[in-house]
Amino acid sequence: ALHEAFPPDGAPAAGPAQALLQRIAQIPRVSYCGNPLVNSVLSLKSRRAQELGIHMEIQVGHTDTGQLHNLELCSLLGNLLDNAIEACVPLTPTGEPVILVNLHSQGHLLVLAVENPVATLPKSSATGEYFTTKANPERHGLGLQSARRIAQQHDGCLLTELKGSCFRATAMLSTEIRSGS
C-alpha cells in the first residue's frame, strides 16, 4: 500500500509526502490488523509514546472499515493518540502512564476508544465538549474537533468523558455503504 505512493518510475515522492513515507518506512513492522496504514499509525504512535516514557496497550479486533477512507481513519487515530500522549507527558516523572487503545467493529459500527490518565483536568463547555487550555487556542485544540467531524460524516459520534483523572474518547462510525455513494 505504501509503495503505491511512489511514482511509477520508482523515484520517491517529493516534498512532505517523501518525508512522511521515509519516516513510516523506518517504523518497526507490528501487525495489529489487516490494514497496513492503521498498523503504521499505531506503530508510530506507540513508538513515540515509548520514547516519552508512556506505555500503550493496543487491542485491535476485527475491523470492517466499510466506506471509511484510510486517510480519515488514520487522521482519527492520529488525533486521538496525539492528544492522549500529550496528556500523559506531565505524568512521566512520577511513573509510566498507560494509554489504552481499543479498535474493533461491532455490527455496522467501527469503534475506537482511547483512554488515558490526565495530570490537569481538561476544561469543558456547557455542552460537555472539551477544549484546549494551551496558549494560542486558535492554533490548538483541533484534534477532538477533527475526530468529531469525521465521526459525524460517517453517521457516528465522538463521546468524551472524564472519570476522576482518566479521560476517554470513543469514536463510533457507521461502516454501512450509503446509498448514492
Predicted segments — roles?
Residues Q18-Q22, Q26, G34-E51:
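Short beta-to-alpha transition helix within the HATPase_c
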Residues G143-A147:
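Short alpha-helical Gxxx[C/S/T] motif in the catalytic ATP-binding
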Residues H108-G141, G180:
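Glycine-rich/acidic phosphate-handling loop/turn and adjacent ATP-lid/helix
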Residues V30, M56-L77, T133-A135:
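Conserved short strand/loop->alpha-helix "switch" segment adjacent to the catalytic nucleotide/phosphoryl-transfer site
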Residues A49, I85-P93:
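A short, flexible helix-to-loop-to-beta junction within the catalytic ATP-binding CA
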Residues G95-H108:
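Short beta-strand/loop element within the Bergerat-fold HATPase_c
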